[in-house]
Design a protein with these regions (language model features):
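Alpha-helix capping/helix-boundary segments
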Residues: 41-43, 93-94, 123, 177
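Conserved helicase motor
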Residues: 62-69, 144-148
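Short glycine-rich anion-binding loops that position phosphate/pyrophosphate groups of nucleotides
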Residues: 13-14, 91-95, 175-176
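Glycine/small-residue-rich loop that forms an oxyanion/phosphate-binding "nest" at active or ligand-binding sites
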Residues: 65, 72-115
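A contiguous loop/helix-start segment that scaffolds small-molecule binding in enzyme catalytic cores
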Residues: 3-7, 84-85, 163-235
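Short active-site oxyanion
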Residues: 29-35, 112-116, 168-169
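Class I SAM-dependent methyltransferase SAM-binding "motif I" and its flanking Rossmann-like core
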Residues: 103-161
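Glycine-rich, flexible N-terminal cofactor/catalytic loop recognition
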Residues: 1-64
Length: 235
């Protein structure tokens, strides 16, 4: 028996970002009987907007286990081993990129199940594209330390790497801590460091701007409290 295929399906980056989902993705979803995601409730809500006429009751929704033991994930891939295609969804953006879906993809390769990435919105790539910072050498750091001493120490390490290799660093913060994070950046980065703020990407209130720390000190920061955002620093 031939095995099914795992399709990696990008999701909207937020409410109002549905326009970024290409028609060919919707066609693939319509032909998929199994969907893996972090939370079935979120995925169902997204699909009701993207495909109002989709018969959700005919789709089997499988949720990623929180602690992700390999045995639990292998159970999710059982339909593919029996010849059925599976769509893997992220909560927002692309599966496997700063996303727990990477463990599903890892096991799919181990089980020799074909993996097909589909094109769609990735906040990391969109922010890097729009920042004007070095796209040849970059590192996504995820969440930086919350406590100020550890955060300042991490920034020093990043600044050293930037000076040596012109590396661009991308990172995120819990939305309600955005402003606190920006304050620390303002206080601890050299004036000539370039900082890009990319918030609400693909959404109606999208904001993207790259300025030096010195310029940000003069203009002040935008109001991105509780908004999903990426921060990029570079030369």
């Amino acid at each position: 028996m031939s095995k099914g295929i795992i399709y990696l399906m990008p999701s909207p980056l937020g409410e109002g970002g549905e326009h970024a989902i290409a028609p060919y993705l919707l066609q693939r979803i319509e032909n998929c009987s199994y969907i893996i995601s972090e939370r079935g409730k979120t995925t169902r809500a997204q699909l009701k907007i993207l495909l109002p006429n989709l018969a959700l009751e005919k789709i089997t929704f499988l949720e990623l286990p929180k602690h992700q033991p390999a045995q639990s994930i292998e159970v999710l891939l059982a339909p593919a081993l029996k010849g059925n295609d599976i769509c893997l969804f992220s909560e927002a953006g692309c599966p496997g990129i700063a996303d727990p879906g990477a463990e599903v993809v890892k096991l799919a390769h181990h089980l020799q199940i074909k993996v097909v990435p589909m094109v769609g919105p990735s906040s990391i790539l969109l922010a890097l594209m729009a920042s004007g910072l070095n796209g040849q050498r970059f590192t996504f750091m995820g969440y930086l330390p919350v406590k100020k001493p550890e955060l300042v120490a991490q920034l020093k390490v990043m600044l050293l790497e930037m000076s040596k290799n012109a590396t661009t660093f991308l990172f995120i913060e819990t939305p309600y801590r955005n402003e606190a994070c920006l304050d620390v950046l303002l206080q601890n980065l050299p004036d000539n460091t370039r900082l890009c703020i990319a918030a609400d990407l693909t959404l109606p209130d999208e904001f993207i701007s790259t300025r030096t720390i010195q310029q940000w000190k003069k203009t002040g920061f935008p109001n991105i409290h509780k908004k999903p955002a990426l921060f990029l620093i570079g030369q």
